[in-house]
Amino acid sequence: RRTLTIIDTTSEMREIDLDRIGKRELLLGRNAEQCEVVLADPIISKVQGKFLMKKDSVAYEDQDSSNGTFVANMGENRLLSKKDGYVELSDKSVLRIGNIHQPDQMVLLLYRDSEETEKWKRQAFGSQPISIGRDGSNQIVLHSPGVSKVHCTICRQNGKMMLYDRNSVNGVLVNGQPVRGMTALRDKDLIQILDFQMFYTNGYIYYRSATSGISLYAKNINKIVGRGKKKKKILNNVNCEIRPNEFVAIIGGSGAGKTTLMSAISGFDKEFTGAVYCNGVNLIEQFHSLKSIIGFVPQQDIIYENLTLKRMLLYTAKLKMPKDTQRQEMEQRIHAVLKMVDLEEHQNTYIRKLSGGQKKRASIAVELLADPKLFFLDEPTSGLDPGTEKNLMMTLSKLSKEQNKTIVMVTHTTQNLHLCDKIIFMGPGGRLCF
């Protein structure tokens, strides 16, 4: 479902389902007789722009409008004009129309290509500060273990709206840039905490308490190892897109660069050229702010075998979850992840007594504690019998859809690839074949 969320100059919000219009080309503008997407605002040209609805994507072109269109897309911020032609939009791309120096006189459009789990909510500012965090006492509650109890506050100060980061574990981004202590907010600013997006406009915060998933886009990824005559390219101009909540397998022959690619797009290997965008934010540049939404399960299970499963998860929760997390919250999260991986009845079993498939599920449970939305696994089915492998693949597929996880795994086996939404096939020399 491809949608536009629009905030106009009066700070009113509305949502348009682009697919429901049912046309390949959609004009955006003030003229209701010509345009399918009508914005009755004087800042908008009669015909402002055009959306091109492709099978798997949407592109936008400015139609030589009076004010142009500012686009924030894949880490790029620029003013579009007719001569730029079509620009491919990614999930959570932001378009702004108007004078960039007068943001209160701008119209903002947020493009989404994934199904949202809930509608936008609106929080008005009064005389008291607004607090945002995990705890139920906040005015804006974000349901994620990675969000601090009180993550940040917003208040009026000397005629400005100021956002203060309250020493949160995972930080705050405003328009893609990390907040160092505090920052002044401008109208139509985009606030991001982990994978939660919020907008500030004219004394209101628009937000969602739950998120729909993470998109990932790899652009021109190249990696070279060795020196001199031993120099070798192991990733060769790889471009790929992974949509929110997709279950994706990376396959290919030995030495094709499967694990190398996964290490790059997960942010754990930063020594490559090109860029990786996580919900439109440069993953490498903002890795500190985004790392808590990433889970990584290595091929070798890293779990302590002389503990019961529940006790091992409790120790891990103390390491992975914010320091202000209460024991009761940890217990609730452990119960939830054991249910996700079908290990509830084994919570008091010593890990050494678990089967190979159960140990792999235990490793997955470890990473699920912090509720990562982007999940990577290296050869998760290696060494498992066919029946156990199929059950694990079914669990991963279910996690992607029911728990809003974007899951990427490297695998050699092909028996159960029909359970995946997408397959990335790597060939010799680190080339993307399919």
Specify the residue positions occupied by each region the protein language model found.
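Intrinsically disordered, low-complexity acidic Ser/Thr-rich regulatory segments
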Residues: 1-66, 73, 79-145
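Hydrophobic anchor residue at the start of the ABC signature
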Residues: 364-365, 392
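Catalytic Walker B motif of ABC-type/P-loop ATPase nucleotide-binding domains
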Residues: 375-378
